[in-house]
Each structure stands twice: as C-alpha cells, then as structure tokens.
Amino acid sequence: MSIRVIIAGFKGKMGQAACQMVLTDPDLDLVAVLDPFESESEWQGIPVFKDKADLACFEADVWVDFTTPAVAYENTRFALENGFAPVVGTTGFTSEEIAELKEFSRTQDLGGLIAPNFALGAVLLMQFATQAAKYFPNVEIIELHHDKKKDAPSGTAIKTAELMAEIRESIQQGAADEEELIAGARGADFDGMRIHSVRLPGLVAHQEVIFGNQGEGLTLRHDSYDRISFMTGVNLGIKEVVKRHELVYGLEHLL
C-alpha cells in the first residue's frame, strides 16, 4: 500500500522538488498540497488547500513541510495532532520547540523527522566534523546559501556546532583580547566556535568546517549544487517515519 503524502509549501523550490520526487515513486501517493497563496483548486489533478485547518479530517500518512520558519512549528504540531507523521525541512526551530514536539509525538505514538539538511553528504559532513572536533577543538564554520534564505545561521550549521560541542573541549576560538572593528566581523559565537553566514545569488547550500592546529589544518566541505541532492533524504524520511513512534531531530537517526 502506498504511503499517502501531503506537501505543505509545495510552490517553493524545495516543495516542487519534493512533489516531483513523490510523483515518480510508485511507493508514494501525493494526495494533497498546501499553499496559502495558491489561487487554483487543483495542481496536476491533486487537491490544493489554502488553510491547513481544512486538512484536519483528511486521510494521509505523512506531512512534508517546506514552508517558512514563521509557521513551521505550528504546522508540525498540527500534523501530529491530526495523525500525520511530519517530515520537516523547514528550519528555525528552537531547542525548546524540538523538545516539546518530541514529547508530543510520543503521546500521539507517531514518528516524525525534523532535518536541518536532507543531503546525505551533509549528514556525513556533520559526523566527520564531530569526530574531528575531539582532536581539533579550534574550529570555525562557514555556511553559504542562496540569498532568499530567511534564517541565519543555517540549521545545518547550528546542528553541526551542537554535535561538535558534545565532543569538543569547550574553548573560546580566537585571541582572548581580540577586538571587532566592525560589529559581527567574527561571526556568531556558539560555545566558543564561530559561525559565519554567506548569502549570495547563485548559491544553493554549502558548508565548510575549518579546523586548525599547530602547523596544520583540516577542512571539511559539502556542496549541494541542486535541490535534487536533498530528495534522497526526503524519500528516506517519508518511508521511515511511518515505522517509528517518536519524532527525531536529524536525518542521521534514520540511517
């Protein structure tokens, strides 16, 4: 039996890529799409909804969310309330929101996934960076994205820093008496690590994790040149969450 999928934010670039992926997979069935600004009632024969409240009694298994940080939390909560296992690529969640959604998913006996990045290479980058941080505590992150991205730093950069912080010796990167001649020049501070965000047209999603040590350096980098790079992870997420009973944060938990 096919997994019935709703895609919220289907008009965006990630939403469109997800729609095409679902439509071409015989194990998946795209049963509805959601966008508050869509004027048509159907898209390729699939019903279009403008208000998520109208989906409250809809029959579906998985809610895929590529919307905006402003509505991602309430969308994920709505999905869990109505029996849809959420697969969320929208970023901007706080740690408190993630913890609350995990707990709520357990009470609903539903699986779910919030993933800062669905590219398998990005997941591997985070794992490699975590291993390296044990031996190279001096580290900075540079994340680069298209200029339409609304949150900074990226969810991937934050997740990378969180994972490294669990392993890394907590030290302040840079000179103790350094002075920023322009505010923000050294980037965001996460447990002594610096995170720098670049936003430029032409980019998709890229990240470097740069480690330094006496007389040597190590650079890890991942590049997504096309949004199709995320679809393997989205597909995996859809097929895995229906087997689970708790929401997880990070694609690595499903690998």
From Swiss-Prot:
Q: Which GO terms describe its cellular component?
A: cytosol
Per UniProt, subcellular location reads as:
Cytoplasm
Subcellular location, principal = cytoplasm
Active site annotated at which positions?
A: H145, K149
Residues bound to NAD(+) are G9, F10, K11, G12, K13, M14, D35, G89, T90, T91, A115, P116, N117, F118
**Key words, A-Z:** Amino-acid biosynthesis, Cytoplasm, Diaminopimelate biosynthesis, Lysine biosynthesis, NAD, NADP, Oxidoreductase
Per the record, the pathway is: Amino-acid biosynthesis; L-lysine biosynthesis via DAP pathway; (S)-tetrahydrodipicolinate from L-aspartate: step 4/4
Q: Which GO terms describe its molecular function?
A: 4-hydroxy-tetrahydrodipicolinate reductase; NAD binding; NADP binding; oxidoreductase activity, acting on CH or CH2 groups, NAD or NADP as acceptor
> Which terms does the UniProt entry file under GO BP?
diaminopimelate biosynthetic process; lysine biosynthetic process via diaminopimelate
At the top level, the lineage of the source is Bacteria
Q: Which reaction does it catalyse?
A: (S)-2,3,4,5-tetrahydrodipicolinate + NAD(+) + H2O = (2S,4S)-4-hydroxy-2,3,4,5-tetrahydrodipicolinate + NADH + H(+); (S)-2,3,4,5-tetrahydrodipicolinate + NADP(+) + H2O = (2S,4S)-4-hydroxy-2,3,4,5-tetrahydrodipicolinate + NADPH + H(+)
Write down the top EC class of this protein.
Answer: oxidoreductase
Read off the Pfam families from this record.
Answer: DapB_C, DapB_N
EC no.?
1.17.1.8
Database matches in Gene3D superfamilies: Dihydrodipicolinate Reductase, domain 2 (3.30.360.10), NAD(P)-binding Rossmann-like Domain (3.40.50.720)
Positions bound to (S)-2,3,4,5-tetrahydrodipicolinate: H146, G155, T156
Instruction: Give the UniProt family note.
Output: Belongs to the DapB family.
This chain's function reads: Catalyzes the conversion of 4-hydroxy-tetrahydrodipicolinate (HTPA) to tetrahydrodipicolinate.
Q: What is this protein called?
A: 4-hydroxy-tetrahydrodipicolinate reductase
Tell me the classification of the organism that encodes this protein. Answer: Bacteria, Bacillati, Bacillota, Bacilli, Lactobacillales
